């Protein structure tokens, strides 16, 4: 699979040769786990295995929960309470599934920001990056529909607000909204559709993950230096790489164990910490909650959605130019989806010839401002749209777009990066000096 020179699987026994000539699945598994991997990967390269664990956890717990769930507006809330009270281990299954979604998004955000910092989106890994963004979009759709299924107050009203965004599309919006809901409002048809799609999408995600893995196995892994593995010969490649098994698998298993220690502590001792108490109240279309908020992992983009009100000058200009077609609501919808889309375009927006942020002094400053901006958007997305939160969300939203659309293209032209090492071997030896038996040495970055 990888373009890096390495030893491929060779069948030895008769049964291995027979199977290999008909279905080379052993060779596929061998090339997957023995892929040459840059030897200088740091601890930010653990999130892939955490994400794989989360996907398996969500599929397994979701299948079992679906056996006991009833997708009907009169029975959904009661069926969830039945799972919690009467199904053996049902409460643990639900808490694992709900908190597993949070771990899934924590890991994917760290995975994305690691890629943004180390330039994992740059050539030749654009396809890997775009497939990763498709996975993220599928995760968001799956999580949103899953949040509706318990049929609590926040489930119902969250679905009403979010699906109402499609109604903001000029001309065809209401038709799309009605088609999506299966009627004029969130009701039984909506719940059935969301349950069916929520069950289906994890398997779509699994297929996209397989393509994602295939893509980065074809190009090889990125690494903290952004320097490519030497591919002139197998001997040269071995100076820059080690096999994924056992070196990085052991490291990933250890990291996963540490992450799961924290995860199971949350599941066991404070399983509702990341949830919302209003969702323990059955959905009531006649009673609107005082403050409607989505799950925490949607809050950054929810903040961007709410930031652009009718009194913002950008919205007023867009409304004037479009002769009233683009109002504040539609502008907010465009901004929310644009904030996600702009991440998919980053391979072409970042014009710097240097891949890794480790060697880009100006880039580091703006990147960490972006990370802080993301945290601020998450926080302000859970607040009321009153002063000063409305101004904070507007400023934070403006910086999000400015980073990708203005700062990155300009930095590529004006920044003077530090020269990266010539090879991965050179970087590895600088951090783990052979003279000290591989002991880590402190090197300024």
Curated annotation (Swiss-Prot):
Keywords: Cell membrane, Electron transport, Heme, Iron, Membrane, Metal-binding, Respiratory chain, Transmembrane, Transmembrane helix, Transport. It comes from the Bacteria. Binds 2 heme b groups non-covalently. Its cofactor is heme b. The chain crosses the membrane at residues 50-67, 95-113, 130-149, 194-216, 253-270, 330-346, 365-382, 389-408. Heme b b566 binds at residues 111, 212. InterPro entries: Cyt_b/b6_C, Cyt_b/b6_C_sf, Cyt_b/b6_N, Cytb/b6-like_sf, Cytochrome_b, Cytochrome_b_C_euk/bac, Cytochrome_b_N_euk/bac, Di-haem_cyt_TM. Heme b b562 binds at residues 97, 198. Belongs to the cytochrome b family. Component of the ubiquinol-cytochrome c reductase complex (complex III or cytochrome b-c1 complex), which is a respiratory chain that generates an electrochemical potential coupled to ATP synthesis. The main subunits of complex b-c1 are: cytochrome b, cytochrome c1 and the Rieske protein. Heme 1 (or BL or b562) is low-potential and absorbs at about 562 nm, and heme 2 (or BH or b566) is high-potential and absorbs at about 566 nm. This is Cytochrome b.
């Amino acid at each position: 699979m990888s373009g890096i020179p390495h030893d491929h699987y060779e069948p030895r026994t008769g049964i291995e040769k027979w199977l290999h000539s008909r279905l080379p699945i052993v060779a596929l598994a061998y090339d997957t786990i023995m892929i040459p991997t840059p030897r200088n990967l740091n601890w930010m390269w653990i999130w892939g295995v955490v994400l794989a664990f989360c996907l398996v956890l969500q599929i397994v717990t979701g299948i079992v929960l679906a056996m006991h769930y009833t997708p009907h507006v009169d029975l959904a809330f009661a069926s969830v309470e039945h799972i919690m009270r009467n199904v053996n281990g049902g409460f643990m299954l639900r808490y694992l599934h709900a908190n597993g979604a949070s771990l899934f998004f924590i890991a994917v955000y760290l995975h994305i920001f690691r890629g943004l910092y180390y330039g994992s989106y740059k050539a030749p890994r654009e396809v890997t990056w775009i497939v990763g963004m498709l996975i993220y979009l599928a995760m968001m759709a799956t999580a949103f529909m899953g949040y509706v299924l318990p049929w609590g107050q926040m489930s119902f009203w969250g679905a009403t607000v979010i699906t109402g965004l499609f109604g903001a599309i000029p001309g065809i919006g209401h038709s799309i909204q009605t088609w999506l809901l299966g009627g004029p409002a969130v009701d039984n048809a909506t719940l059935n559709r969301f349950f069916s799609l929520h069950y289906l999408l994890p398997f779509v995600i699994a297929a996209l993950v397989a393509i994602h893995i295939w893509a980065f196995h074809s190009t090889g892994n990125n690494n903290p230096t952004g320097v490519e593995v030497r591919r002139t010969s197998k001997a040269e490649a071995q100076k820059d790489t080690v096999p994924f098994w056992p070196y990085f698998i052991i490291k990933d298993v250890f990291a996963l164990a540490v992450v799961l220690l924290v995860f199971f502590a949350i599941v066991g001792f404070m399983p509702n910490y990341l949830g919302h108490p209003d969702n323990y109240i059955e959905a009531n279309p006649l009673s609107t909650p005082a403050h409607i908020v989505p799950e925490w992992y949607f809050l950054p983009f929810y903040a961007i959605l709410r930031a652009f009100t009718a009194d913002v000058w950008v919205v007023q200009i867009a409304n004037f130019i479009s002769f009233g077609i683009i109002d504040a609501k539609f502008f907010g919808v465009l901004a929310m989806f644009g904030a996600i889309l702009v991440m998919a375009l980053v391979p072409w927006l970042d014009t710097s010839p240097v891949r890794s942020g480790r060697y880009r002094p100006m880039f580091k400053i703006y990147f960490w401002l972006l990370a802080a901006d993301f945290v601020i958007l998450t926080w302000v997305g859970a607040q009321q749209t009153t002063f000063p939160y409305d101004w904070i969300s507007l400023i934070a939203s403006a910086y999000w777009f400015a980073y990708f659309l203005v700062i990155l293209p300009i930095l590529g032209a004006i920044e003077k990066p530090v020269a990266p090492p010539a090879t991965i071997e050179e970087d590895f030896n600088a951090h783990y000096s052979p003279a000290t038996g591989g002991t880590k040495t402190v090197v300024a970055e």
